[in-house]
């Protein structure tokens, strides 16, 4: 079995590359729309409220995608569903470039969200079931590092490519991830654990069985705790990247440019967090590592809000506090390996995909809650 290997094989590398690139373009496709709002508004005559509807709908569809493709992956296998999710969000993104109305744009952004929601769970589950357990955290974190790179790529395409070629061309060329599936279609093995479970069960299980199992017995409590953990952690993440720039500008008097520079410090810390979390969690355990990095993020946010007047005179303290916030977001590297280890093979993909993407769907309300508080 692949997970019993003492060293990485070419098959491991192909799995990691496809899952990492799939997650990079997953985040890229989800964020890209935000950089194209002005161009789209000008041509399709959309109001701000209509853009909010499109953004909220696509985010909500990620929850549906996480549940749907999670169930399908538990029934039909990790490999084909991972490939289908990448094809789904690639198709949705390309077709956005041909949208002529709010209705068509809403539909294709929904398709994009559906594929985006399914990719994360399938990719992490395939890695968890094929990589050596003692290095599972490290390689799960490596896959997660695609997220900030996806955001950066979306920013580059939105600010450099779009002014020259237009928003439609940006959407169309963003369908290139589909080529990943074509390139790696035959080189990606199926999960040994999934195939073993399928043989022991005498064939495929009933399609809705994994989802139904999440609401029974001890699994129900574990699934609920996983969902709550994901919701709280994701709320802290969106707090940092959605509310915090405005806080620096409106409450602390920073210019847009200066606040942007400080946010880049957080992003740099985020890359450090992703790079280190996996190894730390393999060393001291998933829960201990999560607690450590969550405390770092909490301390950083407390310094930047409750104790701003104390640290503001010192550039070094500001730099350190923002770096702590960024490093603390390394907790995201924990969810794939940790959740994969909490659930049995028969319903692993359903549980992992549902926990993260239902939490992501709930984030539609987070900006409203933050504003109210």
Predicted features along the sequence, with ranges:
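Extracytoplasmic gate region of multi-pass secondary transporters
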Residues: 34, 219-271, 367
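Extracellular/periplasmic helix-loop-helix junction of adjacent transmembrane segments
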Residues: 34-64
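Helix-breaking motifs and short loop linkers at transmembrane-helix boundaries and internal kinks
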Residues: 45, 77, 98-104, 132, ...
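Central cavity-lining transmembrane alpha-helices of secondary-active solute carriers
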Residues: 56-69, 264-276
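Conserved MFS/SLC helix-loop-helix module at the cytosolic interface between two early adjacent transmembrane helices
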Residues: 64-102
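C-terminal ends and interior cores of transmembrane alpha-helices
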Residues: 87-100, 296-311
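Cytoplasmic helix-loop-helix junction between adjacent transmembrane helices
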Residues: 108-145
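Helix-loop-helix hairpin linking two adjacent transmembrane segments in secondary transporters
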Residues: 143-186
């Amino acid at each position: 079995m692949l997970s019993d290997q003492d060293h990485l094989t070419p098959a491991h590398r192909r799995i990691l590359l496809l899952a990492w690139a799939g997650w990079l373009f997953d985040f890229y496709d989800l964020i890209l729309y935000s950089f194209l709002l002005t161009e789209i508004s000008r041509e399709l005559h959309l109001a701000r409220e209509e853009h909010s509807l499109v953004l909220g709908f696509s985010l909500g569809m990620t929850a549906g995608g996480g549940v749907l493709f999670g169930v399908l992956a538990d029934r039909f296998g990790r490999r084909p569903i991972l490939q289908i999710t990448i094809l789904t969000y690639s198709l949705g993104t390309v077709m956005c470039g041909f949208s002529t109305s709010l209705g068509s744009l809403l539909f294709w952004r929904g398709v994009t969200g559906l594929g985006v929601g399914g990719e994360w769970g399938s990719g992490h589950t395939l890695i968890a079931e094929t990589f050596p357990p003692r290095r599972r955290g490290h390689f799960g974190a490596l896959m997660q590092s695609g997220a900030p790179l996806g955001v950066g790529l979306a920013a580059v395409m939105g600010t450099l490519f779009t002014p020259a070629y237009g928003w439609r061309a940006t959407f169309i060329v963003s369908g290139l991830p589909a080529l990943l599936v074509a390139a790696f279609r035959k080189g990606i093995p199926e999960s040994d654990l999934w195939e073993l479970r399928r043989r022991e069960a005498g064939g495929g299980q009933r399609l809705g069985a994994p989802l139904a199992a999440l609401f029974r017995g001890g699994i129900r409590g574990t699934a609920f705790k996983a969902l709550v953990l994901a919701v709280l952690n994701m709320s802290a993440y969106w707090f940092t990247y959605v509310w915090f720039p405005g806080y620096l500008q409106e409450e602390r008097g920073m210019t847009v440019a200066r606040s942007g520079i400080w946010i880049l410090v957080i992003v740099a810390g985020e890359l450090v967090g992703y790079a280190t979390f996996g190894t730390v969690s393999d060393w001291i355990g998933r829960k201990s590592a999560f607690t450590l990095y969550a405390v770092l993020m909490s301390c950083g946010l407390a310094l930047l809000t409750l104790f701003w007047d104390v640290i503001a005179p010192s550039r070094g303290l500001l730099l350190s506090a923002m770096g702590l916030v960024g490093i603390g977001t390394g907790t995201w590297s924990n969810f794939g390996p940790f959740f994969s280890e909490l659930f049995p093979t028969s319903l692993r993909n359903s549980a992992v995909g549902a926990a993260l993407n239902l939490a992501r769907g709930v984030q539609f309300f987070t900006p409203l809650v933050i504003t109210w508080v």
